[in-house]
């Protein structure tokens, strides 16, 4: 029961931080049953050089199923289960073993599958001569652990060069099998594909499944082919950090966009890399970014340590970490040191006592308590390196992907439950705003879910229809985008819908119609930057815009 139970206390702490009522959290906690384990797919091609494709399915399906509201199990946790059961990394489990693995990880569903690749003319599927025309055929099944029932086969196929589309299509079908109420469009899933060249994706997948020099080489190759590839940047930065090349790690990790879902993990390791390079201000900034979005106690603690290393007071941050997880003796120890630096000897004594109650064998805490007993009340800590007493706050160096993702998942559940209690119009407004935020981050399936929820709450919401129009445009569905924009404008004139139509008409070379829509948008909002920029584009093509 490792997966769901280990991080329950920090999640409760997060609920307290966001001031959600216990009833809201209880309802969210009861909406479980969405934990998914994706296993590597079996290669039926007879070509071992294509095994990497099987390893790629957990990576892609985890991303897409997470966007559909499922909690997917990471590569590291899957490996933990294999190690715990004494299974090799490349083990292909039977159904009985699969169930044992799923039970070890508290999974409700397991995704299993296979694929075959038919080479195109001119070479094998894995060679440059035939890869472009090779075809991949995929079959997946969903094993429900709760019902002990296997689904019917789920099939898809595509040219091998369109592997992302094939994997996303399979993910969309799988989501529908696990959740009959799942309503995101397939086109939205296809539009969410990473714009990564297939060779870079191959190097990335081979890299994350390799060790040592081979791992580093593959990840560097992936980044050299796709310099803005967030997944490859994260894994390369983590590998550089593990190799203690902290400057290189910091440079690499800083390139992961702040809007990407991987930014939290990237900035956690960026903070550690900066900390180990004694760039404490940089470390503070990185940890602060993570804490602002997911204030787990280990992140707040690390931010506090970075602040303290700069000679600044960090009591409030350490107290926040300790309050969030009072069972962690390190947080009490750190708070005790910070209080001692401030001159609060009574508070420091209280906190170090709490640390020793949790771990009586902590020699550093025992020494700190002894020093506190020697000094007068109100004395400020002045590290005495001559006699060896120079206590330092402890930083957390391990990022738990499971803990972070579990906390983020539960917060989403809490937020959804809170929104469900609002009046319909207010609910629609908040869902629409969330949809726009997701859309701005390129998270198309997540955005569609929010816009759909907004329209369920208020079917006549012009803003929600306008948001859906933007989504359809972004996912490559111009007809759907046009329909949604027109529907939005029937309900209320608005700039967003008008600009969607203007861009669509511009793409169709209907410059007159595009100009009219831009004019209407500027009448509603004369200073709208997007409308002004689009006006210049249309004018440069010889069309007058009034």
Where are these predicted regions, by residue range?
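Canonical tetratricopeptide repeat
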Residues: 235, 269, 302-303, 334, ...
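Short coil turns that delineate tetratricopeptide repeat
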Residues: 227, 261, 294-295, 326, ...
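Start-of-helix register in tetratricopeptide repeats
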Residues: 201, 231, 265, 298-299, ...
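Short beta-strand->alpha-helix linker/helix-N-cap micro-motif
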Residues: 28-100, 104-129, 145-153, 189-196
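Alpha-helical segment of the N-proximal tetratricopeptide repeat
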Residues: 196-231, 235-245, 400-403, 426-453
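C-terminal/domain-edge helix-coil "capping" segments
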Residues: 26-34, 59, 68-71, 97, ...
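Structural signature of tandem alpha-helical TPR/SEL1-like repeats
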Residues: 210-217, 242-255, 276-289, 307-320, ...
């Amino acid at each position: 029961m490792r997966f769901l139970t280990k991080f329950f206390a920090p999640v409760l702490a997060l609920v307290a931080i966001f001031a959600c009522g216990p009833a809201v959290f209880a309802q969210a906690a009861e909406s479980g049953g969405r934990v998914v384990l994706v296993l590597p797919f079996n290669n039926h091609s007879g070509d071992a050089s294509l095994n990497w494709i099987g390893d790629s399915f957990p990576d892609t399906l985890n991303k897409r199923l997470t966007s559909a509201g499922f909690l997917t199990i990471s590569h590291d946790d899957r490996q933990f289960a294999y190690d715990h059961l004494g299974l090799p990394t490349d083990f292909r489990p039977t159904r009985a073993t699969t169930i044992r693995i799923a039970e070890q990880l508290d999974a409700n569903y397991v995704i299993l599958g296979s694929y075959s690749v038919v080479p195109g003319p001119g070479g094998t599927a894995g060679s440059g001569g035939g890869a472009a025309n090779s075809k991949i055929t995929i079959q997946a099944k969903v094993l429900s652990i709760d019902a002990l029932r296997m689904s019917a086969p789920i099939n898809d196929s595509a040219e091998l060069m369109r592997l992302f589309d094939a994997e996303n299509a399979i993910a969309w079908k799988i989501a529908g099998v696990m959740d009959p109420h799942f309503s995101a469009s397939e086109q939205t899933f296809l539009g969410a594909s990473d714009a990564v060249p297939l060779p870079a994706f191959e190097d990335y997948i081979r890299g994350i499944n390799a060790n040592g020099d081979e791992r580093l080489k593959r990840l560097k190759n992936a980044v050299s082919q796709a310099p803005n590839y967030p997944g490859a940047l994260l894994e390369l930065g983590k590998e550089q950090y593990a190799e203690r090349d902290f400057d290189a790690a910091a440079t690499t990790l800083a390139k992961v966009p702040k809007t990407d879902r991987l930014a939290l993990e990237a900035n956690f390791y960026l903070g550690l890399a900066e900390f180990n390079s004694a760039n404490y201000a940089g470390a503070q900034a990185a940890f602060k970014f993570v804490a602002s979005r997911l204030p787990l106690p280990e992140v707040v603690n690390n931010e506090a340590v970075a602040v303290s290393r700069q000679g600044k007071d960090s009591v409030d941050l350490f107290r926040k970490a300790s309050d969030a997880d009072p069972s962690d003796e390190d947080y009490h120890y750190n708070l005790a040191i910070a209080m001692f630096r401030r001159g609060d000897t009574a508070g420091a004594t209280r906190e170090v006592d709490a640390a020793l109650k949790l771990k009586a064998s902590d020699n550093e805490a025992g020494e700190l308590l002894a020093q506190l007993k020697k000094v007068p009340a109100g004395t400020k800590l002045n590290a005495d390196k001559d006699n060896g007493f120079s206590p330092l706050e402890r930083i957390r160096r391990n990022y738990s992907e499971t803990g972070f993702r579990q906390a983020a998942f539960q917060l989403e559940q809490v937020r959804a439950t809170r929104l469900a209690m609002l009046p319909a119009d207010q609910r629609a407004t908040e869902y629409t705003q969330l949809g726009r935020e997701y859309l701005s981050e390129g998270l198309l399936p997540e955005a569609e879910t929010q816009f759909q929820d907004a329209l369920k709450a208020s079917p006549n919401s012009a803003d929600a229809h306008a948001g859906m129009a933007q989504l359809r445009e972004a996912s490559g569905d111009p007809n759907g985008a046009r329909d949604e924009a027109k529907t939005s404008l029937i309900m209320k004139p608005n700039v967003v819908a008008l600009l969607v139509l203007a861009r669509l008409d511009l793409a169709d070379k209907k410059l007159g119609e595009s100009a009219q829509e831009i004019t209407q948008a500027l009448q509603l909002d004369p200073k709208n930057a997007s409308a002004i920029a689009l006006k210049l584009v249309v004018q440069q093509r010889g069309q007058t815009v009034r």
